[in-house]
Amino acid sequence: METKVQVECGGRTITIETGKMAKQASGAVVVSSGDTRVLVTAVATKTAKEGQDFFPLTVNYQEKAYAGGKIPGGFFKREARPSDNETLTCRLIDRPIRPLFPDNFLNDTQIMATVISADKDNDPGILSMVGASAALMVSDIPFQGPIAGVKVGRIDGRFVANPGFEEMEKSDIEIVVAASKDAIIMVEGSAAEVSEEDMLEAIFFGHAAIQGLLAAQVELAEKAGVAKREVLPPVVNEALKAKVKELAYSRMKEAVRIKSKVERHNTIDTITGEVLTALAEEFEGAAKEIKGFLGDFEYDLVREHIIKDGERIDGRDTKTIRQITTEVGLLPRAHGSALFTRGETQALVVATLGTSIDEQRIDSLFGESKKRFLLHYNFPPFSVGETSFRLAPGRREIGHGMLAERALARVVPKHESFPYTIRIVSDILESNGSSSMASVCGGSMSMMDAGIPIKAPVAGIAMGLIKEGDDFAILSDILGDEDHLGDMDFKVAGTSTGVTALQMDIKIGGVTREIMGVALKQAHEGRLHILSKMAETIGTSKAELSTFAPRITTIYVKTDKIRDVIGSGGKNIRGITEATGVTIDIDDTGKINIASTDKAACDMAIKMIRDLTAEAEEGKLYMGLVKKVMEFGAFVEIFPGTDGLVHISELDTERVKNVTDVLKEGDKVLVKCIGIDKQGKIKLSRKEALGASLPE
């Protein structure tokens, strides 16, 4: 049966319908706004795989080329591997729904969001977030929703829900908020150095904006009338649990307080191995259960110690930042480099400057665009003492890189004043929590080391949460284990003035305004501390670019001279680049950027362009080259491609019988421009230039 609900959100009508498409899926909806349509399906297997001990949730998001009236490029002419934007949207859909499945539901579950129509004003990613929740709500899959997502902007001081793409260009805040009826579940986005108080207002403005979407999903689920599957609670072997506790609890209590990550993990591994050996005969085949009980003990012990005693795994209190060491300029040939170390997390971050040729071309549903600021985050397995087979960057690396990129993009100079392409690469060398925020700190320092005139230094910090009943503790600069055992990972980046990026994920049902307010305030204090540590090494951008970075010189020519610079089939511009080795970029306005690490080569290229575009001026002297001799005079080239006529009467003060008596082809001759007619023909005189010389 086809069922449909409609709701207003941010002045836009959003429609959710089910029962028309993909009816064999466990749940399927089409979410639409304007001309944008997204089909979202949810399917879960009937039973879990034998021995399954984690929840296998997969989320896929794909933008069909036909949705924008396009045919895919490439040889095969079909959609291929996901773009970075599609990967990031997968993460946006995944993160808010993942905490809302029952703990003992371990069936393979797949969410597929397919963009089947797209306009340029309604974000299909936001509709997909709503659709994922709605598809689960109308299915028999157990799900503790609904949730909904909304994009929040602030334009001219006014918060706006789901602004269009053009509107967002005027906004100083761009965040995505996902929430349930009573609590925030996920936040992600960027801002132009906005205060923590304003960010909090934006988040809860978004929470208020989605209430109608939540109610609409409940109504849709009631109309669909599909009963949820029953999820039985896990059967606990109490005898085994008691035995494991007897053998390991006191030792685990000591182990979780070992400050070194490697030593702590090794000790826990040793305890695990000894318990497995001791119980192997009595409880044969129970290794997985035993490891589960030990993990539960570790979880409870760490959290209890933090809540009751205010002391964390490594001995810090809740607000202390780990020791920070920094260094810049450590790679001699790189344009800018920084080594940022915070505790057992270390990032080598390198900044490289390029030209417009190095810009990333992005082909999307809405046309082609160019990207001139890039940040690539790499997380090699050795950073955590592991081995793995590495291919392309995974979803996590792409997501962490984009978070760091957003944090730094707000302080990068505008292209008009700094016409460079900038690429930041962050290689994580060690990791024990907060590696993406180490990338932000190192990226800021590497740009300053490269001489890029950033608006202000940026630092980032990861905040955690331990919540037991009504008691909670906010943790500054969390460890990897605190992320794993805690309830929240809240990353905040910004300058001393305000926030430039944030990202929050939780593992519980949601967080309140009070918790978020405390976390943002504590993050601000931590960020200022980190910025002060960074400033001890470098606090402002170097006055000069690296000697190995290209220098870009900008000149302007008249628009009708652009073709003269390019030449037939690109002959002229190709000749300049081959002769000088420079890189040249010309736009339609006549703006020309010339890039080279060699100043002399750049100067030569400028002269060649000036010669190609120069115009003769009456009364001015020129050193010309005789190109052709005729009976009535000689044609003399005064600029490349620009000739003028020296009439026989203008060759000398005396009467000249034959032109060849004075000039021959290939001669260099000093001439003076004595006129330009209406057709642009240039009249030259050798006679007027006799006795004169070119100014130096």
From Swiss-Prot:
Q: Name one Pfam family in it.
A: RNase_PH
Q: Which residues bind Mg(2+)?
A: 483, 489
Cofactor or coenzyme needed: Mg(2+)
Q: Which reaction does it catalyse?
A: RNA(n+1) + phosphate = RNA(n) + a ribonucleoside 5'-diphosphate
What Gene Ontology biological process does one annotation of this record name? mRNA catabolic process
Q: What class of enzyme is it?
A: transferase
Cleavable signal peptide: none
Asked if the record carries the keyword Magnesium, the reply is yes
Keywords per UniProt: Cytoplasm, Magnesium, Metal-binding, Nucleotidyltransferase, RNA-binding, Transferase
Q: Where does it localize? A: Cytoplasm
**GO MF annotation list:** 3'-5'-RNA exonuclease activity; magnesium ion binding; polyribonucleotide nucleotidyltransferase activity; RNA binding
Tell me which EC number(s) this protein carries: 2.7.7.8
Protein's UniProt keywords contain tRNA processing: no
Task: Indicate the segments forming the KH domain, all copies.
Answer: 550-609
Q: Which SMART domains match?
A: KH, S1
> What domain of life does the native source organism fall in?
Bacteria
Which Gene Ontology cellular component annotation is one that this UniProt entry carries?
cytosol
State the HAMAP family in the record.
Answer: PNPase
- Please describe what this protein does: Involved in mRNA degradation. Catalyzes the phosphorolysis of single-stranded polyribonucleotides processively in the 3'- to 5'-direction.
Q: What is this protein called?
A: Polyribonucleotide nucleotidyltransferase
